[in-house]
C-alpha cells in the first residue's frame, strides 16, 4: 500500500490544513497518512476563538519512526507539508524528508510554505519563515507558495507578472524543480491568477474571482493537495496544474453558490476528479532561465 505523508495543521470543524488536503487526495485515489502539527477546534478566523494545541517536534519524529518500524516509509510516494507550529517542527520535517528519501529516492517532497497572514488570523511562530526559506523550500522537489511567500524565498519584491517570472527563476535556481504560485495577486483584480514555473517554461492560469462575504480558509491547502495527487497519478506537470486549478474553482463555486464560509469539499467532491469547467492556460513569452 503506497501513500502520501501529509504533515500540517488540522481542524476538527471545517476544512483547513490536513482537513482540507486529505479528502481530495483520497478522492483522487491515494492513501493518505496524516500527521498533525496542530489540532484546533476550528480555523483561527472565528471571532469566538478556537481551542486546541500544537504538537511537539518529537511527536512528529515518534510517528514517523512508528511508520518506519512497519516498513511503511519505503512505500511513501510523497511528503506534503503545510502549516508548521514551531521552528522545531521544521527540523523534524527535514529529518522526515531525509529518512523517506533514503528509503524511497523516487518519492517527492512538496512544500506549501505557510509563512502566515496576520490580517487573516494566520500567525506563525518565530523562526519558521527563516527555516522555510533556508532549508525546507530549497530541499523540496515542488514548492507551492503564494505571491508573498515566493517574494520571501526569492528575496525580491513582486509587483508585476515580469517580477513574478523573475522570482520563479530565482526559486528554481535554489533547488525546486517546480514552482506553483497558488495565488498571484499582482496580475488582475477581477480574476484569480495562478502561475506554474518549470525549466520548460512559465504558464498562467486565470479564473473568475469569486467575492465572498467571508473568504474561505484552506484554499491553498486544497490546491497543494490536488497538485500533489495529480503528479502522483502520472499527470504531466501541466496537466496537474490544469486539474488543480479547475477542480479548486469547482469547489469554490459551489461554496459561493451556497453562501458558505467553510469550503464545501464534500458536496463538491465530483469536482475533485472531474472538474465541470476548464479554463485556458497561457504560456508566457517572458524568458525563464535556470542555472
Curated annotation (Swiss-Prot):
Catalytic activity: pyridoxal + ATP = pyridoxal 5'-phosphate + ADP + H(+)
Family membership: Belongs to the pyridoxine kinase family. PdxY subfamily.
InterPro entries: PM/HMP-P_kinase-1, PyrdxlKinase, Pyridoxal_kinase_PdxY, Ribokinase-like
Pfam families membership: Phos_pyr_kin
Originating species: Photobacterium profundum (strain SS9)
UniProt protein name: Pyridoxal kinase PdxY
CDD domains: pyridoxal_pyridoxamine_kinase
Keyword field: ATP-binding, Kinase, Magnesium, Nucleotide-binding, Transferase
Enzyme Commission number(s) of this protein: 2.7.1.35
GO cellular component, one term: cytosol
An example Gene Ontology biological process: pyridoxal 5'-phosphate salvage
Disulfide cross-links: none
Residues that bind ATP: 112, 144, 149, 182, 207-210
Domain of life: Bacteria
Subunit-structure text: Homodimer.
Top-tier EC class: transferase
Cofactor: Mg(2+)
